[in-house]
Amino acid sequence: MPEPVAEPALNGLRLNLRIVSIVMFNFASYLTIGLPLAVLPGYVHDAMGFSAFWAGLIISLQYFATLLSRPHAGRYADVLGPKKIVVFGLCGCFLSGLGYLLADIASAWPMISLLLLGLGRVILGIGQSFAGTGSTLWGVGVVGSLHIGRVISWNGIVTYGAMAMGAPLGVLCYAWGGLQGLALTVMGVALLAVLLALPRPSVKANKGKPLPFRAVLGRVWLYGMALALASAGFGVIATFITLFYDAKGWDGAAFALTLFSVAFVGTRLLFPNGINRLGGLNVAMICFGVEIIGLLLVGTAAMPWMAKIGVLLTGMGFSLVFPALGVVAVKAVPPQNQGAALATYTVFMDMSLGVTGPLAGLVMTWAGVPVIYLAAAGLVAMALLLTWRLKKRPPSALPEAASSS
């Protein structure tokens, strides 16, 4: 974690502009994720002739690489400083585009081309974990730890914005220049971001002795568990809302997903100071309550408008969960370990989203689509109970007070 700067009285637009000037590098990393997202599955399946399994695996490789590399990204950010980690991550995003370009050149040899695509996806996953973790810590170093919740919130906003822009833009690039055109666009985005990042002033890495990974995990895992449970609600909306609408015989699933995204981003924009004013655990519990109501409305919906209101409330509720719990988790460790803490905490969400799809699919096959939303509401209720217990525990029993041994 960077050493905290002197925290001037930054407010409103000036504060947001300083944060956005850093988190735009995370925007660039997620844009390189969004650009090929709607193209590669069809390219692998239709143009290259591989099965749907291989098409899905090519996409999933990036997520696995992100999951496995994220703890290392946090630790290196603590030791080397976040700017170097961001630049390293953006270079990885550039190399992923180079992998796509080489795969296109090797298209006459399908297995070699597939391996190059897979290598590009793995490098992209590593690059994103470094760029994303580093940009959050860089932003905190620039505006001060008082505003860590706002920095995390803005990172989420640019993530959604980049993914929303990237997918249709990637389709246009592919229609214009094939896989080569898409690869060059990815490389151009990453290269531009690197060139913009290099002149920016660094924030110093903290020179304190880092805690071992087990000690960091021991201090943040309860907050991570609450995040993982709450993330199930997001997972079932994002993955299965289309099947839910089909099972009901309704139209409008795409609009429901748009409502979720608007509610998610809008809530973060409307309540930028909520975490500082009420405290992370209090905000998290309020959010859990709203998310539970939303999921119950979806699961019991008899009319399309009920489902849409439920999706809207779920997006509002889930919006501030990550920054609210993240603020508390990061402060549970010394400053020199806050990068590792943030990365370790984020892994819980990565894992939750990874297992929610398959498990919810099994439940859906056994009990029907609506049941998965009721089950997700139950998991969020468990997150609410866990957070309430954390709030009620005496300071000596909280994870941040736990021994590092």
UniProtKB/Swiss-Prot annotation:
Location in or out of the cell: Cell inner membrane
Broad class of the protein's primary localization: membrane
Residue spans crossing the bilayer: 19-39, 48-68, 85-105, 106-126, 129-149, 156-176, 178-198, 224-244, 252-272, 283-303, 309-329, 344-364, 366-386
Gene Ontology MF annotations: transmembrane transporter activity
CDD domains: MFS_YfcJ_like
PROSITE patterns on file: MFS
Membrane-topology descriptor: Multi-pass membrane protein
Record keywords: Cell inner membrane, Cell membrane, Membrane, Transmembrane, Transmembrane helix, Transport
Highest taxon above the source species: Bacteria
InterPro entries assigned: MFS (IPR011701), MFS_dom (IPR020846), MFS_trans_sf (IPR036259), MFS_Transporters (IPR050171), MFS_YhhS-like (IPR023008)
Family: Belongs to the major facilitator superfamily. YhhS family.
Protein name, per record: Uncharacterized MFS-type transporter YhhS
UniProt source species: Salmonella typhimurium (strain LT2 / SGSC1412 / ATCC 700720)
